[in-house]
Amino acid sequence: MKNNPLISIYMPTWNRQQLAIRAIKSVLRQDYSNWEMIIVDDCSTSWEQLQQYVTALNDPRITYIHNDINSGACAVRNQAIMLAQGEYITGIDDDDEWTPNRLSVFLAHKQQLVTHAFLYANDYVCQGEVYSQPASLPLYPKSPYSRRLFYKRNIIGNQVFTWAWRFKECLFDTELKAAQDYDIFLRMVVEYGEPWKVEEATQILHINHGEMQITSSPKKFSGYFHFYRKHKDKFDRASKKYQLFTLYQIRNKRMTWRTLLTLLSVRNGKRLADGIRGR
């Protein structure tokens, strides 16, 4: 393996110029410099400022593509992934940021990819507050990988780090309207083995930023239902109960007593109690 491998970074974006620029700035601050960033704009109606910003950077590592037709987040992710030239690859959402050491932290654990599907790390969460250092933000610690947990819910998050050829082999499912990350991570785990968790927090998840959210509730339900039908043969009885309970929560549909008794488990019972308490 090369000591200074090229890392490809893919970023889909749509009508969030200021947030996308913030994400790009966090990539530019990386303490590891051998990367390329492929930004695919999914036919935004407002995009000139973002294009001008990238052009003014005059950084050959950054490529900006504005599509003439809106094709959806998964399609533009795949478009960027197939253009990637790096040995390794990872993604960034246009409303998130990286800590300066994200790429170097992942590279320090790259040997784990020989026996693991991908790497993932903890995150920080920002709910709009002003901060000077990421470490001052609340930590979003992720669970160490376990099949029992992962087959019930996405414990990985929204981004992973792995060999580029693995993403090119799997790609995102353009038919899914929700759970797209969960879907590709699950397929990678089935194909390449368990993932490896890195303990450092290297990403800042921004929530409640006031801009348009990409997934609406009806799409989320139909997409998650599609995801469940696609993978239900992989799930054991406990995982199926958990997944079906999730579908009822997404749809916000009242369960009959018969359905409730059918899906009842210790974990679902706790979720039900938390819901009643408004947590």
UniProtKB/Swiss-Prot annotation:
What InterPro entries would the database entry show? Colanic_acid_synth_WcaA (IPR024009), Glyco_trans_2-like (IPR001173), Nucleotide-diphossugar_trans (IPR029044)
GO terms for molecular function, please? glucuronosyltransferase activity; glycosyltransferase activity
Q: Does the keyword Transferase apply?
A: yes
User: Could you give a single Gene Ontology term from the biological process aspect?
Assistant: colanic acid biosynthetic process
Alphabetically sorted, this entry's keywords are: Lipopolysaccharide biosynthesis, Transferase
Pfam families listed in its UniProt record: Glycos_transf_2
Pathway given in the UniProt record: Slime biogenesis; slime polysaccharide biosynthesis
**Which protein family is it in?**
To R.meliloti ExoO.
Q: By what name is this protein known?
A: Putative colanic acid biosynthesis glycosyl transferase WcaA
Q: Which organism is it from?
A: Escherichia coli (strain K12)
Report the gene name: wcaA
